[in-house]
Amino acid sequence: MVPPVETKAMSKQNHPARWTLWTTVFCSFLLALFTPQLSRAQYKADHIPGFAGLESGTQAPPGIYVGDLVWIYPTSTIKDNDGNKVGNGSASLTSSLDVILGSVVTNYKIFGANYGTQVALPFIKNEIQLNSLDVSSSFAFSDMIVSPVVLGWHLKQADVMAGYNLYIPTGQFSATGTGNTGLGMWGNELTLGSTVHLDKTHSWNAAANFGLEFHSSKKDEDIKVGDIGTIEGGLSKTFYKKVSGPIPMITNVGLAGYSQFKITGDSGSDIPLFLQGYKDRVFALGPEINTFIPKPRLTLLFRYEPEFAARNRAQGQTILFSIAWVAKSLAKHP
């Protein structure tokens, strides 16, 4: 037993320590209470959902393609683990991205599939890092995407596509920065998708593509973003219009959607306590129209997908425009 006098002496000596402890706990509570835009929102992955939609399981015919894609994502909402809106909604953010695309689909066969490859050079403004709306960055180069292997099979009533995407941390990243244009980590993604033709004329199509993404630790931080699953696809109707020349104008109209969800939670000693043990998810659904114009060999696309049922992440709207040009056709005609 400790003598009473020594007990009082120890109590006086430990009082500053107890004060510091309770001050820390109280300040942590205030931080969690008055920084709602970060509440339980998870670290972002490389794959931005909504880049694929109708016929997402179909590889393009053999050829050399170049294109440009514009992605706009306005949001003023962060959802918590129960789906409730966090904060008063006064903050807002619009993240935007421009991607220069180049791809080649060859006649070379691997396991009966056409072999292809693709590279994407992205430029982003307001890169969302932690589903926080406290982001401000100028338009600058982001993390590069290389797809060294893309395989496409074309069956009688279905198409199948499989591939591998490598996300290279070429964008600006600082562990303490709010103006980053990259995520500061390497990403690897395996993809598998299919487009099923629902009638003999291939005018009705249902498609889905699944990507499994996993990551390295972030630069200068003991943080590893959890594995991510992304499903993108849609249901479409194809219309053909005769124009001058042998190839008709082809238009796809339909409903596109996506879901993205964390399969495993974020890990590492640098993850704040109030972010540990949670996983995020989101769904989106909306219209898409794309048209191939044969004479200039251009494909124009518009997709709009408002998000819903988000958990532990931002909930906004995906708006996407793209244009692709067939620089050279490599298709073999009988």
Q: Where on the chain are the PLM-derived regions?
A:
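Residues on the lipid-exposed face of transmembrane beta-strands in outer-membrane beta-barrel proteins
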Residues: S56, D68, V99-T106, V146-L151, ...
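Residues that define the transmembrane beta-barrel architecture of outer-membrane proteins
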Residues: P62, S92-I100, V135-I145, G182-N188, ...
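Sec/Tat signal peptide C-region and signal peptidase I cleavage site
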Residues: F34-A41
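Outer-membrane pore/translocation modules
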Residues: A113-G116, P122-G226, Q276-D280, P294
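Surface-exposed strand-loop-strand hairpins of Gram-negative outer-membrane beta-barrel proteins
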Residues: Y43-K44, Y73-L97, N131-S137
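Transmembrane beta-barrel strands of outer-membrane/channel proteins
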Residues: V66-P74, T117-F123, A162-I168, A208-F214, ...
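Outer membrane beta-barrel transmembrane domains
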Residues: G50, K79, K85-V86, D220-P334
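Short loop/turn motifs that connect adjacent beta-strands in outer-membrane beta-barrel proteins
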Residues: E55-G63, N107-G116, W153-V160, L198-W204, ...
